[in-house]
């Protein structure tokens, strides 16, 4: 089957090639490399990551297609029951759960030591490494923490290598650790087993509620989605695996160019093009400087900061709906359209459950210290390096994202309700404001001092779905398509 070939390509070719490139340059000492070799390493690692991203895109595509088929089927075959594909795509083994389990073990070591517990609970997270270095027990714990970062610290805050990785900036991990020490939530594996039991029971109950035709199609689509969905997170875990090494090479080169007078800060090197870096290296080789490159880097840095204030619309023009011929393709959108005022924001229901709590609005990693344990995390979007914040959150709301976004997958594994793709959550919600997140229907209610019962009364029903012809007819068509695809699948497997 083509899907199997994509898996083999990712697992046996793309991933090993990427990791081999990253390991080869990781073994090189940046301080001893010539300037030209540092630039060559940066370029090779960036290209290797780009090639790996193509393999990731294949894994994402097959997960997204099978998820969309399951989600659309549930909408048509069980209208009004608020069934979402995310309810059935939970509890699978993943690097996210592995990382949380290891971090919980580290937190357990702290809880088991009076000395460490006192240090961790009384020291601000940014100062923890320095405080722990002052004791033998603390140093031993830091050694274990370093091994944790060696395995998981490559995770990125965004796809731009100008941003530090988790290994470069471990603040969110330390914040999560403090929360785990002060407010233990139990064994992540036990929570995962409970999620699996709930998921499987819901699948059995849902299958029983359908007639034979719908039951067959539900099981077919569920099998595809559950087979391909978990591969997405495994593939994405390695995105940015070369970034820590690339950054070390770049910062060493940047340091040399600062010494040579061509740059003002090490990080300026990230804002130069390849030809400009080559020119700076050539100038340094003959004892000259290129101060014009420092000005160029400063202007580009300022432009990058200015662009952070922009909010991209879901589609252009904004009132356009994604369509392919006669087919509505809005299932692929990553933002819902919401009115600029009103008490309810609509988004995508991606992780089931319902919770009300104050919000912590976190716009970037610079705001991580403002995350309050026991609140609902509200942000533009999340990437793997944001994962440690989930252990402190009771729910998740984002501006951008859908059922297969990183945040939705992690929220389901943490068992917290999530509504993604509201478009305007970070501008409509303020930190400390009470909100109600309904991950079953995809709404976020701004409570404004009202209690949850009042909010439930004024919270709207799920948005009605548009049906161009009866649901039974749609399900029949789905069954025909499913039969054709199943036959194609069997042919591929025999070939």
Predicted regions and their residues:
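Contiguous hydrophobic, helix-prone segments at protein termini
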Residues: 1-344, 348
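Hydrophobic single-pass membrane-insertion segments
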Residues: 260, 490-495
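Mature hydrolase/peptidase catalytic cores and their serpin-fold inhibitory cores, especially
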Residues: 317-374, 378-379, 384-387, 396-397
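Acidic, glycine-rich flexible loop/linker segments
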Residues: 360-366, 370, 374-375, 380-466, ...
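Juxtamembrane/start-of-transmembrane alpha-helix segments at the extracytoplasmic/lumenal side
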Residues: 468-474
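Hydrophobic alpha-helical topogenic segments used for membrane insertion/localization
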Residues: 474-492
């Amino acid at each position: 089957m083509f899907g199997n070939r994509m898996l083999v390509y990712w697992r046996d070719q793309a991933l090993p090639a990427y990791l081999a490139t990253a390991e080869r340059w990781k073994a090189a000492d940046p301080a001893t490399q010539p300037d030209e070799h540092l630039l060559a390493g940066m370029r090779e690692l960036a290209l290797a990551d780009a090639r790996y991203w193509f393999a990731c895109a294949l894994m994402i595509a097959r997960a997204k297609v099978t998820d969309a088929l399951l989600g659309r089927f549930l909408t048509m075959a069980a209208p009004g029951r608020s069934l979402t594909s995310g309810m059935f795509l939970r509890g699978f083994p993943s690097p996210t759960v592995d990382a949380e389990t290891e971090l919980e073990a580290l937190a357990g070591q702290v809880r088991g030591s009076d000395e460490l517990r006192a240090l961790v609970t009384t020291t601000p997270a940014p100062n923890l490494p320095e405080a722990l270095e002052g004791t033998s027990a603390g140093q031993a714990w830091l050694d274990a923490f370093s091994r944790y970062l060696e395995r998981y610290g490559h995770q990125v805050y965004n796809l731009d290598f100008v941003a530090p990785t988790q290994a470069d900036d471990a603040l969110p991990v330390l914040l999560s650790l403090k929360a785990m020490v002060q407010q233990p939530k139990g064994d992540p594996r036990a929570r995962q087993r409970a999620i699996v039991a709930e998921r499987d029971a819901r699948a059995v109950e849902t299958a029983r509620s359908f007639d034979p035709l719908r039951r067959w199609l539900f099981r077919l689509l569920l099998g595809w989605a559950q087979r391909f969905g978990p591969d997405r997170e495994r593939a994405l875990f390695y995105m940015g695996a070369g970034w820590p090494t690339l950054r070390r090479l770049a910062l060493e080169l940047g340091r040399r160019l600062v010494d040579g007078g061509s740059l003002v800060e090490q990080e300026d090197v990230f804002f130069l093009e390849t030809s400009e870096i080559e020119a700076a290296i050539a100038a340094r080789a003959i004892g000259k400087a290129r101060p014009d490159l420092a000005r160029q880097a400063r202007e580009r840095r300022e432009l990058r900061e200015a662009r952070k204030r922009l909010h991209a619309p879901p589609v252009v023009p904004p009132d356009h709906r994604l369509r392919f011929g006669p087919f509505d393709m809005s299932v692929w959108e990553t933002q819902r359209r919401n009115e600029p005022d009103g008490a309810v924001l609509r988004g995508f229901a991606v992780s089931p459950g319902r919770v009300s709590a104050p919000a912590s609005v976190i716009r970037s990693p610079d705001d991580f210290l403002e995350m309050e344990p026991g609140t609902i995390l509200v942000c533009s979007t999340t990437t793997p390096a944001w994962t440690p914040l989930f252990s402190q959150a009771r729910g998740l709301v984002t501006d951008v994202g859908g059922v297969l976004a990183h945040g939705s997958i992690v929220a389901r594994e943490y068992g917290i309700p999530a509504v993604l793709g509201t478009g305007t959550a970070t501008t409509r919600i303020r930190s400390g404001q009470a909100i109600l997140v309904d991950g079953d229907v995809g709404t976020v209610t701004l409570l404004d001092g009202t209690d949850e019962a009042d909010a439930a009364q004024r919270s709207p029903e799920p948005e009605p779905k548009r049906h161009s012809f009866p649901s039974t007819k749609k399900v029949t068509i789905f069954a025909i398509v499913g039969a054709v695809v199943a036959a194609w699948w069997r042919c591929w497997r025999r070939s």
